A protein has these predicted regions:
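Active-site entrance/lid segments in N-terminal catalytic domains of soluble metabolic enzymes
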Residues: 1-161
Length: 161
């Protein structure tokens, strides 16, 4: 099974287009991969202003421009998952958390774990495949329950998950 690694910031419409484009090129099954970040909560405007003010001196010293305020992209991982369900994808993989899995019946679900606790959470959520990510993988860590340091276990340590 191949895995279609579509962009994290892929809108639901772009995701649908990408799925259909892959289907035009192959009849083989493939998976969609999404990031499932934990909710970060709301940032108080006053706290944001304080942080911007504190960082301003560093931006001045380094001759960096004042960054544009972040703007939401107008869609959620739930919107992406609705497309996955509508398109009747055979498989879905995700990392950085456990997305809402309701409405994904019949889709093989694969989640990333960097610790035994995360593997247990994925199993409890009902995923079909737990993909353990040892520190040997390099790059970003798919941790979502554990601290960064706890997520640095090697693959051999995770083999019993």
């Amino acid at each position: 099974m191949a895995s279609a690694q579509l962009p994290v910031r892929c809108s639901p419409d772009e995701l649908r287009d990408a799925i259909r484009a892959v289907r035009l090129r192959t009849k083989l099954p493939f998976a969609v991969n999404v990031f499932a970040p934990l909710p970060s909560g709301e940032v108080e405007p006053d706290a944001l202003q304080v942080a911007r003010r504190e960082l301003a001196r560093y931006r001045e010293r380094l001759h960096l421009p004042d960054p544009e305020p972040a703007s939401p992209h107008g869609w959620t991982v739930e919107d992406q998952l609705a497309v996955v369900a509508q398109e009747k994808m055979p498989a879905l993989s995700f990392t950085f958390g456990i997305p809402p899995l309701n409405g994904l019946d019949g889709i093989a679900l694969m989640g990333t774990a960097t610790t035994p606790e995360e593997a247990a959470a994925l199993e409890h959520a009902g995923v079909d495949v737990v993909v353990v990510q040892g520190s040997e993988a390099g790059g970003h860590r798919g941790s979502f329950i554990s601290s960064f340091d706890e997520g640095l276990a090697g693959l051999v340590a995770l083999a019993g998950c």
